Amino acid sequence: MAGPLPPLNQEPAFQKLQEYYDSKAKDLNIKDLFVKDSKRFSKYSLRLHTQNDGEILLDYSKNRINDEVWDLLLALAKVRRVNAARDAMFSGQHINITENRAVLHTALRNRGTDPVLVDDKDVMPDVRAELAHMKEFTNMVISGVWRGCTGKQITDVVNIGIGGSDLGPLMVTEALKPYGKGLHSHFVSNIDGTHLAEVLKKVNYETTLFIVASKTFTTQETITNATSAKTWLLEHSKEPESVAKHFVALSTNKEKVTEFGIDSTNMFGFWDWVGGRYSLWSAIGLSICLSIGFENFEQLLDGAHFMDNHFKTTPFEKNAPVILALLGVWYSNFFKAETHALLPYDQYLHRFAAYFQQGDMESNGKFVSKSGKPVKYSTGPIVWGEPGTNGQHAFYQLIHQGTRLIPCDFIAPAQTHNPIAGGKHHKILLSNFLAQTEALMAGKTVDEARTELSKAGLCGNELDNLLPHKVFVGNRPTNSIVVKKVSPFTLGALIALYEHKIFVQGIIWDINSFDQWGVELGKQLAKAIEPELDHCNEVSTHDSSTNGLINFIKANWK
C-alpha cells in the first residue's frame, strides 16, 4: 500500500501550478479565451446521457483555464491518488480514519447485483431488506391502511431530526414537490421551541405521523422535540397506546425506541458506515418516501447510482465530479477564493445550497491532514447561495463588482413543472440564467459603458462621474449545469455529483472528509452551561464575556 501523501504545497504537481499561476494567470481572460478558440464550449463541456431523463449538461468553459492549466490540474489529481481513494471508498475500506469506519452511502443506492463488502460481509441483503421495509410502510400510509389512533387516515408527516437527519430529507422533499402523493410534509430540527410549536399549530393529532430520526435515539435536540411532540399527542388522545400509531423511529437503539413507546417493528435502521450528511439515501429518507412515493424514491436512488457509475468508470478529463473538484481547487488554492456560490434557477431547489453548506463545510472544514498535522493551504470553502432570480436582487452585486472572486455554479432545468402564462415565467427565468453567466464573464468595458451613457443622453462631467460605477471587470468564473427537468432521477444525479466533488477535493487536500469533530466542542460546553441556567445565582466560572452573557440572560429570563 502506498505511503502517506506529501503536504499539498510540497507536491511537485502543485508547485508547477503555482509557477503557472504566478507567471501567467493574470493573462487568463475568459472572454479572450473564447475569441481565440471557436471550439472552447465543446472542449470544456460534458453531456451525460441518462436512459429516461434526457441529458445532463455541464458547461465549464467559462472558467479561467486553458489546455495547459487543465493538464496541470489533471496531473495533480493523478499524483494525489484520487483513483486509488475512489476505489478504496467503493470497496468498503475504512477511509474514515478517525472513526475507523467504511464510507458506503453509495451502497444504499447500489442498483446492481454485485456484492458490496464491509469487513468481508456483503451489506446489500441488509440494504435491500431495509428498503423493502420502507416500501411496505410507505405504501400502507399513502394507501390509508395505516391509520391514526381514532381510525382516521394520516394527512401530515412531521420529521423530527437535525443535521443530516433533517437537511437532506427537507431539501429533497421540497425539490420534488411536483411528485407529491398528497401527504403534507413538515420538518422540525431546531431546539428552539418555536420550531415545533409552529408546526403543531398546523396539524391535527388524529391524522399526524411523527418520524423521529436519531441513530442513537439520544440526540438532545431531536429527543427533546420528540418528547414534547409526544406530550402534545397524549394531551389530546389521553391514551398511551396512541404513541405507537403516531410515531415511528429511524434508529438503531431498540431499547430506547421501545421505551419511548414506539413499536420496534416500526423502527427503521441504518449502519455506522452511513454518515449523517450522506444519509438521505437510507432510512433517513423515509419522509421522502412518504412525500413522493416509494417508486419515485427508487428513481432518486437510480439517479445517484448513475452518477456513481460515471464517477467510478470515467477518465478524469471527462469525469464531472473530478472536473468540478479541480476547478474548486484552482480557485481556492491559487486565486484565494474563500467562497463558492450554488445558484439554482428553480424555486423547488431553494434548499439545495443550504443542504450542501453542510455537505461541503462539514466534510472539508478541516485544518489538519490525515496524518494529524496542520495544513498550510486552504481547504473547504464557504458554500452559500439562493435561487435565481431572487439572488440577483440581493447579492449578485458583490459577485459582479465586488473585490472578492466568487466562483459560481448555475443550475437550471430546461423544462418547468409549472408552465404558467404559456411558459412566460420560465422563459424569463432561463433568459436570466443565461445572461448572468455571460455578464459575469464579459463584464462591461469603459468604452462600452461610455457608449451606453452617451446613448442615454449623458455628457461632460455627469458622464465622467458616473462612468467608473458602470464598469464591470468581468472574468468571473462560472459553471452551468442544465438538466432536462428536475425529476427524482436528475436530482439524485445532482446530489451525487456534488458528494463526489467534495470527496475528490478532500483527497487532494489530504483531509478526512467524513468526520465532524467540530460539532462536538460546543455541545460539550452547552452541557456544562445548561445547569447554570437552572438557578438565579450569578455565574463567575467562565471568561468575563461568557459570564456577562449568562448573567444578563438570567436577569432578563422573566
Curated annotation (Swiss-Prot):
It catalyses: alpha-D-glucose 6-phosphate = beta-D-fructose 6-phosphate. It comes from the Eukaryota. Its main location: cytoplasm. Gene3D superfamilies: 1.10.1390.10, Glucose-6-phosphate isomerase like protein, domain 1 (3.40.50.10490). Keywords: Cytoplasm, Gluconeogenesis, Glycolysis, Isomerase. The keyword Isomerase applies. GO terms for molecular function: carbohydrate derivative binding; glucose-6-phosphate isomerase activity; monosaccharide binding. The active site is at E362, H393, K523. GO terms for biological process: gluconeogenesis; glucose 6-phosphate metabolic process; glycolytic process. It is found in: Cytoplasm. Belongs to the GPI family. HAMAP family: G6P_isomerase (MF_00473). NCBIfam families: PRK00179.1. This is Glucose-6-phosphate isomerase.
